[in-house]
Regions:
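Sec-dependent N-terminal signal peptides
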Residues: 4-13
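Helical hinge/lid and interdomain linker segments adjacent to catalytic or ligand-binding clefts
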Residues: 24-27, 68-146
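Extracellular/periplasmic catalytic domains that process cell-envelope and extracellular macromolecules
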Residues: 48-53, 84, 101-105, 119-120, ...
Length: 317
């Protein structure tokens, strides 16, 4: 009996260790890469212009993790002035949830925060914004809302949402589990088949109709010609890393990645996010491409950061 108990205990410990492997990943950015390598994917963007004036609303909230993780205010302070360097773009900020006037003005809302418990009226405002033609880019924890019975309403606005700790999952990932992209989708057309990051994602999310998964974390494949459809069937795949969604006249582009602050200083990650922004707005991505290099290109033409950026004190506003 004792022997059986010991075997059972060892098996349980093995499962716990396996489940915890991702959480033991050491936070570390990718090495900077030459600018000419990135331009292969940005394409030429000199003198590229948007087709119209774009009003962006950046939704943020209090930072809720240790420094370097879920730095909602820090990332807002990085991206808002950067986006405003794009001709014909203006950016407004909203804390926790927009007013109706802000929704009325916005062409695109970018959300990076842990959402509060929204009221039915607020969900109606949000859904009407999307269905009426508004665009949304949802980053990382923005797909989570509590109490969890509100998750279906959130999914109606952005396509996917956290189902609760029993049904949805989270974990860190690194080089052994690349981010695979559906690079025949318009948002990612012409990009690499896979990108390596050292970050965190969620998977097994609640999905609405009209969701298309276009990015997934999976064990590294030796087959360079493996299709994205086959990646989604891989054992151990973490789908829902990136998705697109349409509801009414609106578009949403979502990701469960973007946990660490240094990830936003990675040129390939910026490129992916900016592609999503352009797709959601039905705009050519070229006018946004200078931001891939903005503030992270050194004198030798290397783009990125070597700073893990963990030495930071969280703020509430």
């Amino acid at each position: 009996m004792k022997k059986l108990l010991l075997i059972s205990l060892i098996g349980t410990l093995g499962l716990l260790v396996a489940a915890d492997r991702g959480s033991r990943t050491i936070p570390q950015p990718n090495k900077p890469i030459p600018k000419e390598e990135i331009i292969k994917f940005t394409g030429q963007f000199k003198d590229a212009k948007l087709s119209r004036d774009i009003r962006i609303l950046w939704l943020y909230g209090p930072e809720d993790h240790g420094g370097g993780e879920h730095d909602y205010i820090r990332i807002k302070e990085l991206f808002v002035p950067m986006l405003e360097t794009v001709t014909r773009v203006t950016v407004e900020e909203a804390y926790m949830f927009p007013s109706q006037d802000q929704f009325d003005r916005a062409d695109l809302m970018i959300q990076f925060l842990h959402l509060p418990d929204l009221t039915d009226k607020q969900f109606t405002m949000y859904q009407n914004y999307v269905d009426g033609g508004g665009s949304v880019v949802s980053i990382h924890e923005s797909c989570i809302i509590r109490p969890i019975d509100r998750a279906n309403k959130l999914a109606g606005c952005i396509g996917c949402s956290w189902q609760g700790n029993k049904d949805s999952h989270w974990g860190k990932f690194a080089k052994g589990h690349p981010l695979y992209l559906k690079n025949d989708h318009p948002a990612f057309k012409g990009l690499r088949q896979s990108v390596t990051l050292n970050d965190e994602s969620y998977w097994d999310l609640r999905k609405r109709n009209n969701v298309e998964v276009i990015g997934a974390i999976a064990p590294k494949s030796d087959n360079e010609k493996v299709s994205f459809a086959d990646i989604l069937k891989t054992e151990g795949v973490r789908s829902d890393a990136f998705w697109t969604y349409t509801s009414g006249k609106g578009r949403a582009f979502g990701t469960t990645t973007g946990h660490y602050t240094y990830t936003y200083f990675d040129p390939m990650y910026r490129l992916i996010l900016l592609r999503g922004i352009a797709w959601s707005l039905k705009e050519d991505p070229a006018p946004f491409m200078p931001l891939v290099f903005h503030g992270i290109t050194d004198d030798e033409g290397l783009v990125g950061t070597t700073d893990a950026m963990m030495n930071y004190k969280n703020r509430r506003k």
